[in-house]
Amino acid sequence: MSETATAYKLFRCLQCGFEYDEAIGWPDDGIEPGTRWDEIPEDWSCPDCGAAKVDFEMVEVDR
């Protein structure tokens, strides 16, 4: 498997700046570490401000 296929991504809320890291997940909402952004339900919202999932953008990070 290539590094690109396994690299985890980071998504930032455009409303408040909250960051969802696929490597960490969000256990408070039952989202296990390693959960890909596409696997999160469409009705999930930002835990900090309540913004919709569509209000997040992928952030380029060096790991």
Curated annotation (Swiss-Prot):
Pfam families: Rubredoxin. CDD domains: rubredoxin. Residues 8-59 form the Rubredoxin-like domain. Its cofactor is Fe(3+). Binds 1 Fe(3+) ion per subunit. Keywords: Electron transport, Iron, Metal-binding, Transport. It comes from the Bacteria. InterPro entries: Rubredoxin-like_dom, Rubredoxin_dom, Rubredoxin_ET, Rubredoxin_Fe_BS. Fe cation binds at C13, C16, C46, C49. The keyword Cytoplasm does not apply. Signal peptide: none annotated. GO terms for molecular function: electron transfer activity; iron ion binding. GO terms for biological process: alkane catabolic process. Belongs to the rubredoxin family. Involved in the hydrocarbon hydroxylating system, which transfers electrons from NADH to rubredoxin reductase and then through rubredoxin to alkane 1 monooxygenase. This is Rubredoxin-2. The gene is rubA2.
